[in-house]
C-alpha cells in the first residue's frame, strides 16, 4: 500500500501519531542477516506504518542488496517498504532495474533523491545517461509507472547544505518543483531546532505544498555521534541541547538517557504543532534507541492494537508481495525458516499459492535450493562457530537444542528465528527428549479452542477460536526406527512420515497425497481457515533442504579445520532419519508422542 494511503487511512480511524523506521544496507552478509532479525523484532515490538531502505549507488553488490532488502522486507517479513533511489552514479538502465525489482516485490513507495556525492568525489556531478536533479527522476518514474508508486522527496528545514547563503526561499522553490513533478510526501533531513522546523512547515504550506510533511528524527546515542551527525548535515544545535549534553559528554549511558529525553520533548512539540502526525526515525540500524523514544512518547501499540493488526490474520506473517496475495496455507516444516520457504516458492504464479488445498496433483513444485542463495545456513561460517561451537557428539547437539529451547540461543542451523512462548506447554518434554538423544527440530503443542485473541496461541480475526494438533519433528537413530514404526502400527491417532538422507520414505498416513491440517481456526461469518498443514510432497522438499543444511554445517567445519566435528555431522546425515509425528487427538491432554519416544 502507498504510504500516503496508509497515513490517511490511519488518520480517519485514529488520532494516535504514527511512525516509521529507516535502515541502511550493511556491508557484510552476516550484517544483512542480523538486520533482517532486527527489523523483524522491531516490527513485533512497535508495528511501524512502514520502513525505508537506503540506496547504495554505483552498482555492484551493495546496490543489489538494496533491492534484495526491499524484496525480503515485503515478501518475507510483511513490512510495507519505501525504497530510496538516487541519481548518484545511476544511469537510466540501473534505475530501470531498481524500479522493476521494487515493482515486482510489491513495493509501492520510492524516496526519490539526487543523492550525495560519491565518497571519492568532492562535488556532485551527474553520471552519463542519468539524471541531474531529483525532480527529473520523479518525472521519469511517473512516466514509466504512472501512479503505482507514492513518491517521497527530501526536505531541508535548514536549507540544502550546498545552497549558497542558506537561501530558504530558493530551497523552497526547489522543493516545490519536486512536488509539482509528482512528489507525494516530504521526508526531512534530521534536525534539532524544532522552532525553526515549525516555521519552515508554515512556509512550505504558504508556498502551496499540501502533501504530508514527515520529520526525520535522529536519536542521540553518544555525544561524539551527536556532534558528528550535526556537522555532517550542517544543522544547528540549540543551546538547551548543548547545555544539557556538554557536562555529561563522557558518560555514554547518561548521554543516551538525557539525549532520548531531549528528542522526546522535540517530538512532542512537533506533534503538538499541528503540522506533524508521523515521525520517521533514522535507526542507524540500532534497535533500542528508536523504541525508547516511542515508549517515552507513549505511542507504542496497545494490546488491542496488536490484535487488530491486519498481518496477524494468520499464524505466520502474511506476505505483502502481490504474487502471494492468495496465500493462506503453508507446510509446518518451514515454521522457523520463513526466508527459505518464500525463496523456494518465489517462482509460483499468483493462482498457484494454495488457499484451502495443498498437496494434490495441481500443486506447484517447490523450487530448487539454489533459489535460497549460495548458503542455506543464514549465519556466516565464522558466526556458526561462535554460536554452535564444534559439536563432536549427539550430546553436544542436544545441548545446543536445549539452549535454544530455553531462549539462550536465538537460532540453530535449521531454525532461523528464536523460539517463543508457544512451546511452553511441551517445553519440559522437548528438553527431556533431547536429553535422551532424540534431537527435536520443530514442534507445536495441542490447542483445543483457545480464543483467537490469545497472546500466545491466537491469530486471525477477533471473536474466533483456534485449534492445533500436537506436532513433533525430530532426528532419530535409524536403529530405533523399526521399534517406533512397530509401536505406531496400531495407534489410530498418531500419523507419521520418516525419511533418511537417501530418500527412503515410510509413513502410516492414510492417504499420502492428501494434506493433514494441524492448525485451524473458526471465526464468525467465515469458512474454517486451515493455514498450517503436514503433507508428503512438501515434506520431501523439506527433507532435501534439511540434509543439505547438515552438509553445509559439515563443510563449515572442514573450512575451519575441525575434522572431528565434520565427521560427526556426517554421521548425523548417514545414521539418523528425519521423522515427524502428528497427534490427531487434539482433545486429549496426554502427550502420547513424548511417552512413546521415551520408551524406545
Curated annotation (Swiss-Prot):
It comes from the Eukaryota. The active site is at residue 22. Substrate binds at residues 116, 189, 282. Gene3D superfamilies: 3.20.20.220. Its EC number is 1.5.1.53. One of its GO terms (molecular function) is methylenetetrahydrofolate reductase (NAD(P)H) activity. Pathway: One-carbon metabolism; tetrahydrofolate interconversion. FAD binds at residues 54-55, 84, 114-116, 133-134, 156, 171, 178. Its cofactor is FAD. Belongs to the methylenetetrahydrofolate reductase family. Present with 8600 molecules/cell in log phase SD medium. This is Methylenetetrahydrofolate reductase 2. The gene is MET13.
Amino acid at each position: 500500500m502507498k504510504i500516503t494511503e496508509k497515513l490517511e487511512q490511519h488518520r480517519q480511524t485514529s488520532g494516535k501519531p504514527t511512525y516509521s523506521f529507516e535502515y541502511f544496507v550493511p556491508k557484510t552478509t552476516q550484517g544483512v542477516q542480523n538486520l533482517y532479525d532486527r527489523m523483524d523484532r522491531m516490527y513485533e515490538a512497535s508495528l511501524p506504518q512502514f520502513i525505508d531502505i537506503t540506496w547504495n549507488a554505483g552498482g555492484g553488490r551493495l546496490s543489489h542488496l538494496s533491492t534484495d532488502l526491499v524484496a525480503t522486507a515485503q515478501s518475507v517479513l510483511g513490512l510495507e517498504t519505501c525504497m530510496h533511489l538516487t541519481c548518484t552514479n545511476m544511469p537510466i538502465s540501473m534505475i530501470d532495474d531498481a524500479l522493476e525489482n521494487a515493482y515486482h516485490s510489491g513495493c509501492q513507495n520510492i524516496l526519490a533523491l539526487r543523492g550525495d556525492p560519491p565518497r571519492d568525489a568532492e562535488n556532485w556531478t551527474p553520471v552519463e545517461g542519468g539524471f541531474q536533479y531529483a525532480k527529473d527522476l520523479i518525472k521519469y518514474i511517473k512516466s514509466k509507472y504512472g501512479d503505482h508508486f507514492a513518491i517521497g522527496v527530501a526536505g531541508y528545514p535548514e536549507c540544502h547544505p550546498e545552497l549558497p547563503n542558506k537561501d530558504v526561499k530558493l530551497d523552497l522553490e526547489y522543493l516545490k518543483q519536486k512536488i509539482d513533478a509528482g512528489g507525494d510526501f516530504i521526508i526531512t533531513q534530521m534536525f534539532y531546532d524544532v522552532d525553526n522546523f515549525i516555521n519552515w512547515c508554515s512556509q512550505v504550506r504558504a508556498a502551496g505544498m499540501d502533501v504530508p510533511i514527515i520529520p526525520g528524527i535522529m536519536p542521540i546515542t553518544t555525544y561524539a555521534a551527536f556532534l558528528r551527525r550535526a556537522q555532517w548535515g550542517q544543522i544547528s544545535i540549540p543551546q538547551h541541547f548543548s547545555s544539557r549534553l556538554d557536562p555529561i559528554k563522557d558518560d555514554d549511558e547518561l548521554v543516551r538517557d538525557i539525549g532520548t529525553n531531549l528528542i522526546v520533548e522535540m517530538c512532542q512539540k512537533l506533534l503538538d504543532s499541528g503540522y506533524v502526525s508521523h515521525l520517521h526515525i533514522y535507526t542507524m540500524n540500532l534497535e533500542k534507541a528508536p523504541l525508547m523514544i516511542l515508549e517515552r512518547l507513549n505511542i507504542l501499540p496497545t494490546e488491542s492494537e496488536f490484535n487488530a493488526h491486519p498481518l496477524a490474520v494468520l499464524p505466520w506473517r502474511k506476505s505483502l508481495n502481490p504474487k502471494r496475495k492468495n496465500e493462506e496455507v503453508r507446510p509446518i516444516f518451514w515454521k522457523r525458516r520463513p526466508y527459505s520457504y518464500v525463496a523456494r516458492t518465489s517462482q509460483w504464479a499468483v493462482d498457484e499459492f494454495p488457499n484451502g488445498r495443498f498437496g494434490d496433483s495441481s500443486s506447484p513444485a517447490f523450487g530448487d535450493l539454489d533459489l535460497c542463495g549460495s548458503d542455506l545456513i543464514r549465519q556466516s561460517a565464522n558466526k556458526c562457530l561462535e554460536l554452535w561451537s564444534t559439536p563432536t557428539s549427539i550430546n553436544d547437539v542436544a545441548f545446543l537444542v536445549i539452549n535454544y529451547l530455553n531462549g539462550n540461543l536465538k537460532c540453530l542451523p535449521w531454525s532461523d528465528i528464536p523460539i517463543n512462548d508457544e512451546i511452553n506447554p511441551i517445553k519440559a518434554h522437548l528438553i527431556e527428549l533431547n536429553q535422551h538423544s532424540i534431537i527435536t527440530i520443530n514442534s507445536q503443542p495441542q490447542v483445543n479452542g483457545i480464543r483467537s485473541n490469545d497472546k500466545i496461541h491466537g491469530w486471525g480475526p477477533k471473536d474466533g477460536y483456534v485449534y492445533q494438533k500436537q506436532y513433533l519433528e525430530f532426528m532419530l537413530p535409524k536403529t530405533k526406527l523399526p521399534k517406533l514404526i512397530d509401536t505406531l502400527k496400531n495407534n489410530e491417532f498418531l500419523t507419521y512420515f520418516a525419511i533418511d538422507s537417501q530418500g527412503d520414505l515410510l509413513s502410516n498416513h492414510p492417504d499420502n497425497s492428501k494434506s493433514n491440517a494441524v492448525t485451524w481456526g473458526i471465526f464468525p461469518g467465515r469458512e474454517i481457515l486451515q493455514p498450517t498443514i503436514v503433507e508428503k510432497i512438501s515434506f520431501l522438499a523439506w527433507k532435501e533442504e534439511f540434509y543439505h543444511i547438515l552438509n553445509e554445517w559439515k563443510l563449515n567445519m572442514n573450512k575451519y579445520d575441525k575434522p572431528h566435528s565434520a565427521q560427526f555431522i556426517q554421521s548425523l546425515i548417514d545414521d539418523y532419519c528425519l521423522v515427524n509425528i502428528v497427534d490427531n487427538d487434539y482433545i486429549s491432554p496426554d502427550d502420547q508422542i513424548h511417552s512413546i519416544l521415551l520408551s524406545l
